[in-house]
Each structure stands twice: as structure tokens, then as C-alpha cells.
Amino acid sequence: MTLTFQYLVDTAPQVVKEKLEQLKTLRERPDYHPEPSTYHHIEIVVNRLLQTGDPDLAMAGMLHDICKLDCVKIHPKHGHPTSPGHDLAAFDLITQTPEVQQWIHDNGADDAKVAAICLYHMRFHQLGQMRPFKREAQIQKWTEQGIWEKLQYHGAADNMLVEFDMDDLDKSFKFNK
């Protein structure tokens, strides 16, 4: 079976389906997210990542922003919704919910890697703000965990400001701008 976004939605555990449905109402900061809702953002990210043929990436795409509505606050400076801690909340959802873990496995992915990609997807976008020593240490840690390459693909797919190009991931990295 070839994975598709709709297949993943249709086979998702009820908790994931409910969160996805609720995310159709969350409009994020338009200068970073021109898409109409977080649900649409997730759909775009998943469709980009499905091109890689890597189920870990497809499942991380489905789950990386799944808890945004649970963590949403209005940013005091710009007035747009922000969701601090949504990465940790997604990690917790995966690691603490057996039916989510089973769904990940049923789709050929590794729940530990999917959880780690979700946990670190925001930190990945902050690499450019780190001192070189700290950045290299973080990359080494992710390499040892077997997720560094996956984070690069995920980071590129998660960037809505440029077209996703699997053959030129660097152009998508926010920390290169």
C-alpha cells in the first residue's frame, strides 16, 4: 500500500483524528504560514515528505504540529497565535499513547524516531542562532540518534516560505537565510 495523506487520516487513531479536525480552525502567523490552517500546513508537509518514501518522515509530518491547539497562546507583540511547547506535547502524545504508537508501526515507521523528529523539529530551525560549537554538538547528537538526515528533510518540508526541493534542501533551511 502506498501511503497518502488521506489514508493516514482515515487510519489514524481517534485522538489524532480529533486533533486534526480541530486544527482546521487554527490560523497561524501568516508571515511564516501562508496556508489557511494548521491542518492544511500538516497536509502540505506530509505530501512533501511522502516524496521521500520514508515512513518515519511521513508519520513525523502527520504528528509534528498535532498539539498546536493544545498549547496555543496569543503572542503579546504581534497578536498572532503561537504554540510554545507543541513539540514536547507531540512527543508526549506519541510516547504515552499506545494506539498512536501502533498506528505509526502499522505504517512502517519507528515510533522512537518519529517522536524524536517531532520533539526536535523546532530546535532544528534554531540551528542558525546557535554558536558553532553548540550547533555542532547538537548535530552530532542527532546523528548518533539516527535522525539528523531526517530532520533536514523534515525542516525543508516544514518551511512554507520556499518550494520544497528534495535535491536542494539547503535552500529551504531557515538557518541559512
Regions found by a protein language model. Name each.
Residues 1-74, 78-79:
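Acidic/His-rich, divalent-metal-binding segments that scaffold phosphate/diphosphate chemistry
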Residues 48-167:
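Divalent metal-dependent catalytic cores for phosphoryl transfer on phosphate-bearing substrates
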Residues 169-176:
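A cross-taxonomic marker for long C-terminal extensions/tails that follow the last structured domain
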Residues 3-7, 15, 19-22, 113, ...:
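Exposed alpha-helical structural elements
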